[in-house]
């Protein structure tokens, strides 16, 4: 922040004044007690906001750790490991949903047989999309993540 204060007294290094005295005197006379208190209050408020933000983030990670399977680990997962496990868990659940969807469609086709409106001719089978359900739904290609040990 630039100050609009003008220096008081002789410039630093002038006759009779020590070289560093001017800067210290100018800082006190320019800032004044009101400005210093205001800056300190703003800094305290910013620190409190950052503390609340970090507490909220840590609470969110704790909640995520409770729902993500840890597969036998006794130690608390790091934030990075928690995100990796959450991603793996979401991908696994997406695959389960895709398999369930395929099974359900297959059963419905077998039950309806010839009467199925989506089959072009009797005895035809539904084309199963090789792309996993999650990729169709969310449009992303999952990448394998190395697990930290």
Swiss-Prot record:
Reported consequences of knocking out the gene: Mice are viable and fertile but display multiple optic abnormalities resulting in blindness. Normal hindbrain morphology, however mice show disruption of brainstem auditory signaling and binaural processing. Loss of retinal circadian rhythm photoentrainment, and decreased expression of Opn5. Loss of the retinohypothalamic tract connecting the retina to the suprachiasmatic nuclei. Loss of axon bundles, optic nerves and chiasmata, with a decreased thickness of the retinal inner plexiform layer and inner nuclear layer.
Tissue specificity annotation: Expressed in retinal ganglion cells. Expressed in the cerebellum, trapezoid body, ventral nucleus of the lateral lamniscus and in areas of the auditory hindbrain such as the cochlear nucleus, lateral superior olive and medial nucleus of the trapezoid body. Expressed in the modiolar nerve root and in the cochlear in a small group of bushy neurons within the acoustic nerve. Expressed weakly in the sensory epithelia of the saccule and utricle.
Record's keyword annotation contains Acyltransferase: no
Cystines in this chain: none
Domain of life the protein comes from: Eukaryota
InterPro entries registered for this protein in UniProt: ATOH7_bHLH, bHLH_dom, bHLH_transcription_factors, HLH_DNA-bd_sf
Any one GO molecular function term: transcription cis-regulatory region binding
Quaternary structure annotation from Swiss-Prot or TrEMBL: Forms a heterodimer with TCF3 isoform E47; interaction may be required for DNA-binding in certain situations.
PANTHER family the UniProt entry points to: BASIC HELIX-LOOP-HELIX PROTEIN NEUROGENIN-RELATED (PTHR19290), TRANSCRIPTION FACTOR ATOH7 (PTHR19290:SF99)
General function of this protein: Transcription factor that binds to DNA at the consensus sequence 5'-CAG[GC]TG-3'. Dimerization with TCF3 isoform E47 may be required in certain situations. Binds to gene promoters and enhancer elements, and thereby regulates a transcriptional program of retinal ganglion cell (RGC) determinant genes. Although the exact mechanism is not certain, retinal transcription regulation by ATOH7 has a role in RGC determination and survival, photoreceptor population development, targeting of RGC axons to the optic nerve and development of the retino-hypothalamic tract.
Name assigned to this protein: Transcription factor Atoh7
């Amino acid at each position: 922040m630039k100050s609009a204060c003008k220096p008081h007294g002789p410039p630093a290094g002038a006759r009779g004044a020590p070289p560093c005295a001017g800067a210290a005197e100018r800082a006190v006379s320019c800032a004044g007690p009101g400005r210093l208190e205001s800056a300190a209050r703003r800094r305290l408020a910013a620190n409190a906001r950052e503390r609340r933000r970090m507490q909220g983030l840590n609470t969110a990670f704790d909640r995520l750790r409770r729902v993500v399977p840890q597969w036998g680990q006794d130690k608390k997962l790091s934030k990075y490991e928690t995100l990796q496990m959450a991603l793996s868990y979401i991908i696994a659940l997406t695959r389960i949903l895709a398999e369930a969807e395929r099974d359900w469609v297959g059963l419905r086709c077998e039950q309806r047989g010839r009467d199925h409106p989506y089959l072009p001719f009797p005895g035809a089978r539904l084309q199963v999309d090789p792309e996993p359900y999650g990729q169709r739904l969310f449009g992303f290609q999952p990448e394998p993540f190395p697990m930290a040990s």
